[in-house]
UniProtKB/Swiss-Prot annotation:
This is RNA-binding motif protein, X chromosome retrogene-like. The modification Phosphoserine is found at S88, S91, S162, S171, S325, S326, S327, S329, S349. There is a cross-link at K22, K80, K86 (Glycyl lysine isopeptide (Lys-Gly) (interchain with G-Cter in SUMO2)). Its main location: nucleus. Residues 148-161 have a biased composition (Pro residues). The modification Omega-N-methylarginine is found at R122, R141, R161, R169.
Amino acid sequence: MVEADRPGKLFIGGLNTETNEKALEAVFGKYGRIVEILLMKDRETNKSRGFAFVTFESPADAKDVARDMNGKSLDGKAIKVEQATKPSFESGRRGPPPPPRSRGPPRGLRGGSGGTRGPPSRGGYMDDGGYSMNFNMSSSRGPLPVKRGPPPRSGGPPPKRSTPSGPVRSSSGMGGRTPVSRGRDSYGGPPRREPLPSRRDVYLSPRDDGYSTKDSYSSRDYPSSRDTRDYAPPPRDYTYRDYSHSSSRDDYPSRGYGDRDGYGRDREYSDHPSGGSYRDSYESYGNSRSAPPTRGPPPSYGGSSRYDDYSSSRDGYGGSRDSYSSSRSDLYSSGRDRVGRQERGLPPSMERGYPPPRDSYSSSSRGAPRGGGRGGSRSDRGGGRSRY
């Protein structure tokens, strides 16, 4: 755009609309021989648009005119005289703006892309609701929990608690607690489900549909665990174990947010209510946790063996993750947890505590989703406990 037009061609701007070609020729003709005078006029009114192109035969003359006449007054108006740029002034003038325009769109695009990028990342959190945040937290903290995890393994329930507490707190701040309290109140089952549904619907609605289990498991524990799974894989792990033991826990899990929170603090409380069971769940959860740690990725959550699977799978797959993780985690976690436990030689009590949740939970998750979760899971749970 800045490229100069042919030598000797000048752009004359800021002209009085009354100034015509003759006046221009009279003024500029004294500097040298003029080859062409092109006064730009409005097509409709044929009035001067206030600028013209004057082409001198000699480029030197044009330079002199540009130097002497630029800023001078012509017919009462200060005119601008400069080397004409390609293409003609009109397009030329438009030309310069176009670059900005072209640039502008890119900027817009960039901004948009940036925005899109930002939102996506944000979207993750938002989409998940508190979960993704939890996940992030859990994931970010996950490693810490894992690190903590080992002690928890040896420590047992307390460490677990602490571990969850970290993530939990963060998530609990988010509403894990509220979900929990709600979970307890509503933990009656359907009520809980309703509360969950609102949130769950938000995140899970798609998943809920996908998981008839969700509805059923809103029935509770395992199903809930699934919910949790959907939202918060980590919570699921805890939730599975924890709530498999304690119904209150289940409530939280069903919440999914509460999972972490629930399993962290809320769960602890619920656990306390359940008492031994909660501990067992913790232990089992710890065991599972330790087992997963052996695995590796799971460490972050430990019990999260499942959770890890989910989280990893989840991160990778998103929705499919849920289904896959649910089926797989159920089978795999149950089998694996046991194996891990046995390998570790965890105390039978732990083993015991852990399996029940697993069995009951796995069975409930499998059966409950179809069967109607609530009753099934409950019976499973009860049976599992008594059984083990």
